């Protein structure tokens, strides 16, 4: 009986340590090794905050990265995604498209999909559009620590996905704080355990909420 209890305790401890460690590792690894070395059908700019049509620092960095790899002929089309927050006069997608066109990308090469204020909804929206066009290879321009979750969702919906992390702004690998890594690891765990089962998890949970979620998951 004592041996059984010890084994159960050992298993619980292993789960408590292994699951969060795995999530942290895959999130960190995707950030360090994004794997953008082949061409794609489209570049997707993950939505982020804008103010009266002007991209915020995070969105601007993602747009700059998308423009950079578009200029290097990685893909013939850029897709901007993202709805607006309540009270906004425009959307993340529209602000992104406007910036790209204003900075030299032809209008015909930028598609705006003003849907979703979270990664899952945005992913569904652009995958639906890509399927209509009979294409499935995508490069996601986003923050380094967001790469793993964004890629995972895209692959779950049938895309061949890679990520090109922002090279500037507050969320580069060098500038990001560990709490962003922890938050993304927690959000990834929430997605693979609940999101894949149709239970929607908001991107806008606080770090504290995610920590409580991970604690409940592994206990």
Question: What does each of the following model-derived ranges do?
Answer:
Residues 86-92, 147, 184-192, 207-214:
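A general structural signal for short secondary-structure boundary/capping elements
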Residues 2-35:
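N-terminal type II signal-anchor transmembrane helix
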Residues 24-182:
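A structural signal for short, hydrophobic/glycine-enriched beta-strand patches
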Residues 177-204:
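A transmembrane-helix-recognition feature enriched in membrane-embedded lipid enzymes
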Residues 199-219:
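Short linear elements at protein peripheries
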Residues 13-14, 69, 129, 190:
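Enrichment for repetitive, rod-forming helical segments
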């Amino acid at each position: 009986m004592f041996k059984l209890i010890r084994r159960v305790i050992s298993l619980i401890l292993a789960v408590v340590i292994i699951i969060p460690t795995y999530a942290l590792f895959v999130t960190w690894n995707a950030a360090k090794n994004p794997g953008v070395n082949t061409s794609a059908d489209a570049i997707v700019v993950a939505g982020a905050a804008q103010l009266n049509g002007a991209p915020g620092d995070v969105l601007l960095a993602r747009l700059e990265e998308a423009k950079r790899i578009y200029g290097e002929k990685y893909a013939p089309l850029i897709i901007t995604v993202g709805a607006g927050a309540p009270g906004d006069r425009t959307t993340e997608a529209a602000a992104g498209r406007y910036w790209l066109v204003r900075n030299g990308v032809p209008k015909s090469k930028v598609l705006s999909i003003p849907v979703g204020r979270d990664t899952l909804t945005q992913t569904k929206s652009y995958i639906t559009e890509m399927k209509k066009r009979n294409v499935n290879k995508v490069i996601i321009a986003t923050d380094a620590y967001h790469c793993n979750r964004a890629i995972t969702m895209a692959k779950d919906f049938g895309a061949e996905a890679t990520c090109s992390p922002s090279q500037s702004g507050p969320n580069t690998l060098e500038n990001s704080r560990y709490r962003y890594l922890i938050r993304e690891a927690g959000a990834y765990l929430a997605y693979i355990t609940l999101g894949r089962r149709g239970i929607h998890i908001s991107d806008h949970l606080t770090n504290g909420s995610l920590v409580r979620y991970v604690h409940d998951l592994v206990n």
